[in-house]
Amino acid sequence: MFVASKQADEQKKLVIEQEVQKRQFKKIEELKADMQKGVNPFFKVLFDGGNRLFGFPETFIYSSIFILFVTIVLSVILFQAYEPVLIVAIVIVLVALGFKKDYRLYQRMERAMKFKKPFLFKGVKNKAFMSIFSMKPSKEMANDIHLNPNREDRLVSAANSYLANNYECFLDDGVILTNNYSLLGTIKLGGIDFLTTSKKDLIELHASIYSVFRNFVTPEFKFYFHTVKKKIVIDETNRDYSLIFSNDFMRAYNEKQKRESFYDISFYLTIEQDLLDTLNEPVMNKKHFADNNFEEFQRIIRAKLENFKDRIELIEELLSKYHPIRLKEYTKDGVIYSKQCEFYNFLVGMNEAPFICNRKDLYLKEKMHGGVKEVYFANKHGKILNDDLSEKYFSAIEISEYAPKSQSDLFDKINALDSEFIFMHAYSPKNSQVLKDKLAFTSRRIIISGGSKEQGMTLGCLSELVGNGDITLGSYGNSLVLFADSFEKMKQSVKECVSSLNAKGFLANAATFSMENYFFAKHCSFITLPFIFDVTSNNFADFIAMRAMSFDGNQENNAWGNSVMTLKSEINSPFYLNFHMPTDFGSASAGHTLILGSTGSGKTVFMSMTLNAMGQFVHNFPANVSKDKQKLTMVYMDKDYGAYGNIVAMGGEYVKIELGTDTGLNPFAWAACVQKTNATMEQKQTAISVVKELVKNLATKSDEKDENGNSISFSLADSNTLAAAVTNLITGDMNLDYPITQLINAFGKDHNDPNGLVARLAPFCKSTNGEFQWLFDNKATDRLDFSKTIIGVDGSSFLDNNDVSPFICFYLFARIQEAMDGRRFVLDIDEAWKYLGDPKVAYFVRDMLKTARKRNAIVRLATQSITDLLACPIADTIREQCPTKIFLRNDGGNLSDYQRLANVTEKEFEIITKGLDRKILYKQDGSPSVIASFNLRGIPKEYLKILSTDTVFVKEIDKIIQNHSIIDKYQALRQMYQQIKEY
C-alpha cells in the first residue's frame, strides 16, 4: 500500500510538472507571437519582488538590524534609556513603509546622497569635471524659482560627481578617450516617418534595432541613446517675392511662422567600450598606464581602437535604413572642428557652438562646459545661466512605474511635446554568465520572499527566451530633462509631459529629490542615474524607436534656390516645401507635380498660396544663366474663376475666353512675330508648324478621326495646299487682320466644293459669318503676352464645349511651350483632365512634360477627381513624369485609383481619406511621404478671400478690372473684401 501511495504521489507530481511545462510552453509561444508583432513584455520580476528580501531591499534589512542593535547597546545597556530605541524603530518602520510603496526609493536615496553628501561615498569622488557649476543665491532669481541657499555644497558635490566619463583626449577621428579608460563614439541617426509608414513596414524596420543589441552581449560596451528636441526659429521674413500682393501675403505668413513653435528632433547613439574590463583577453588594468613599456601599451590601445571602430561600423550597417552619420571632424575656413565634441557640449545646456579640434589636447574636460556659466537648482525646477547671460529653465521627469509591455510607439507623445528636451536612455548588456547568475539569484529571491508561481513561470519563460538567443538582458536607466525659456512655459511643459506619460500607462512626476542626478545623467553616464534596473534588449530598442520625420526637404540650395515655403509637420518640425527633386542650385531637376484634392479640401488655396511664394524666384540666378533668361513666368490655367482674384492681386493679366466673344487670339500674327525676332531657325519653323497643325485641325473638325485624333478623309493634296497657304500668309509681309478670312480668299476656286478647304474653314471665318468666327479670325494683335510675370487663363466658358475646346487648348499649350525658353517657368493646370480631354492636346502636353525639365520649367497638374484624370489619354505619362505628388483630403477616394495614378500605399490612402484637415500629404519619388499643415489661421481674411475667389465675387472683380480709373487693382480688391460685413 505504501508503494502504491508513493507511486501515486510521483504520478501526480509528474502530471503537475507536465502541466506546468505545457503552461510555460504556451506562455513562451504567446510571448514570441507578441514579440513578432513588436509587443515586448516587461519582466518586472527582475527589478521588483525578485530583488528584495521579504519585500524590502536586502541592504535595508541588514542596515536596519545593525542600527537597531547599536541603538539598543548604547541606549538600553549603557544608559537605560528606551526612547531612542523607540524613535529609531519608528523611523525604520516609516522608511520601510516608503519602500513598500515605492521599491525604487532606496536606490534613489542612495544615488541622490552621492550628490547631497558625497563624503559618505568615496568611490564616486572624481576630479572636478566643471568648475562652472557653482551655486550663488540671487534674490532676482528667487523671484522666479524658490532657491534654497543651503544647497551650494550639494551642487559643488554634484559637479565633482558629474560624469564618470570625463573627456581626456581625441584618440582618433570620431573617437574620444575618457579618463576612465573607455572609448566613446557617436552616430547621428535619422527618424522613421511613422505616421505615413505601414505598421508591417514599421515592425520590419524596428527589427533592425532589435538585432543591434542582440549582437552585443558583453558588459564592456555601454550604449547611450539621446533624443534631442531643439526649438528653432523659421525666419523667412526677409525674402522678396517681387509682386505686391505676394509680398504682403507672404510677409504675413512668414511672420506667423516666425512666431510658431518649430522644433528639430534628432537621434544620437553613443557607444562606449571599457578598456579595463575587456573579456576574452588578459585583463588590462590601470597599472598598464603607469608602466614604462609605452610601446606595448600603445599597441594594445591601437588594437582596441580598431576593434571599437569595427563595432561602430557594424552598428552603422545594421542601422543603415536610419541613415547613420558618424560625428567626426570637419573643416571650415581652414580650421578643424569636432562634431562629436559639439554634441557632448550641447548636452550640458542645449547651447550650440563650434568646437575646435586639437588632437594634442589632453584636457578636453576643461573646455567642455557647453557655454554654461552657472546652474541653479530648486525643488522641482532649475535655471541655467549661460556665458552670454541668457537664461534657460529646466525640469527633470521621473518615471516611477512602467507600462506592462513596451512597443515602438511608447514615447511618441513625448516626441510630439511642445517643448525642448533631452531624453537619454542608458543600456549596458550583460554577458551570458552574468545572465545565468542573475536569473538564478532572482529565482532564489522569489522563493525566499514568498513570490508567486506566476513570477516563477515568468522567470522560466525569460530563461528560455534568453537561452534561445531571442533576447538579451542589460542594465537600463533614463534621464528626461525638459527645457524652456520661461518659468511658466516650463511648468506647462512638465504638466503636458507627465500627462502624456501617464496616458501611456507610466507613473511619472516632476523629479525633486533626484533632480540633480537626472540633470547630470543626461550626458553619457550611468553613475548619476537615480534608478537602474534590468530590461530586455527588445525593451531598450522600443525605448529608443526613432519615430519622427526622416525627410524635411531642403531649405536652401535647391534647383531654384530657397525652398518654396515652410510648412509645419505633425511633430512640429519644419517641412521645407519644394516641387523640384533634390539637387544643387542651378541644376536641371524634375519638378512636375500632381495635386489631388476634393471640393473644399483647400486645393485652390494651396495652389494660389504656393504660386505667391514662387514669386521669390524672380531673383537669385546662377552666374552661368544669361541675362535674357533671368526672369520668371507663371501661367495659371484656371477653371470656374478660382484663381481670378489672386492673379489680379499679383498684378497679372487674367485672360477670360468667352463663347461667342472675340478671343483676341491670332495664331498667324504670333507666328509672323516670331519670324521677325532673334529666334533660332528651329523656333521659327516650330511656330509655323504649330499654326499649320492648328488650321488643319480646324479644317478637319467634322471629319471622322482615328484613335490618334487624325482625320481619315482629309486628303494629302488638301493638306499640302493648306500648309503652303499658311506658310505664305505668315512669311509674307502683309497685314494679318482676320487671317482665316484671308486664307479662304486664297482658296477662291474652292467655294462650291462642300468638302473643299473653303467649306471646311468657313465656320471659323468672319467674312462667311461662321459659327466660330470669334475663335482665331481676329485683329493682328495676339492677346497672349508671356513677357509678363503672371498670367491667368480661365477655361470656365469653353472647356465643356467640345466644338472649340480642343483648338483653344492646343493653341494655348503651343504658346506656353514656346515661352518655355530657358527662363524659370511655372505652368499650373487646374482641373487638368478638362484641358487634356482631346487626344491631340493630351499628346502635345505629354511631349511638353517630357522636355520641360530641360527648359527649366515645371508643370503642376491639379484635379478634384482622380477618376477623371485616369481617363485622360496620357494618365500613365502623368504618373511617370510627375515625381512630386501632393494630396489633400478626399473622403470619397478609391484606393485602386490612387495606387494606379500615384503609387499610394494603403497607409497613405487612409491618411488621404481621413487624416487631412488643412493639411497635405507630400510624396516625392525616392523620399518618404510627409504630412504637413498649411494652417492659415491668423492671416488677414481679405488675403484668404483673394487666394480663392468665390463665384459670387466674379462680377465685382470684373468691375474693378474694367474700371480704368482704378490703378491699384490689388488695393481695390482688399477694400472690397474688407467692406463685406462678414469681415
Swiss-Prot record:
Reaction it catalyzes: ATP + H2O + cellular proteinSide 1 = ADP + phosphate + cellular proteinSide 2
Membrane topology: Peripheral membrane protein
Signal peptide region: none
InterPro entries: ATPase_P-typ_TM_dom_sf, CagE_TrbE_VirB, CagE_TrbE_VirB_cntrl_dom, P-loop_NTPase, P-loop_TraG, T4SS_component
Cellular component GO terms, alphabetical: plasma membrane
EC number annotated for this UniProt entry: 7.4.2.8
MF terms in GO: ATP binding; protein-exporting ATPase activity
Gene3D superfamilies named in the record: 1.10.8.730, P-loop containing nucleotide triphosphate hydrolases
Keyword annotations from UniProtKB, A to Z: ATP-binding, Cell inner membrane, Cell membrane, Membrane, Nucleotide-binding, Translocase, Virulence
Cellular location(s): Cell inner membrane
Main EC class the enzyme belongs to: translocase
Pfam families: CagE_TrbE_VirB (PF03135), P-loop_TraG (PF19044)
Database matches in SUPFAM superfamilies: Calcium ATPase, transmembrane domain M, P-loop containing nucleoside triphosphate hydrolases
Outcome of gene disruption: Deletion of the gene affects pilus synthesis. Mutant is unable to translocate CagA and is unable to induce IL-8 secretion by gastric epithelial cells. Deletion has no effect on assembly of the Cag outer membrane complex, but the mutant machine completely lacks the entire cytoplasmic complex.
Top-rank taxon: Bacteria
Positions bound to ATP: 597-604
Its biological purpose: ATPase component of the type IV secretion system Cag (Cag-T4SS). Acts as a molecular motor to provide the energy that is required for the export of proteins. Required for CagA translocation and induction of IL-8 in host gastric epithelial cells. Plays a key role in Cag-T4SS pilus biogenesis, especially in the localization and stabilization of the pilus-associated components CagI, CagL and the surface protein CagH. Is also critical for assembly of the entire cytoplasmic portion of the Cag inner membrane complex (IMC).
Assembly and interaction partners: Component of the Cag type IV secretion system, which is composed of a wheel-shaped outer membrane complex (OMC) and an inner membrane complex (IMC). Interacts with CagV and CagBeta.
Family of the protein in this entry: Belongs to the TrbE/VirB4 family.
Protein name: Type IV secretion system protein CagE
Native organism: Helicobacter pylori (strain ATCC 700392 / 26695) (Campylobacter pylori)
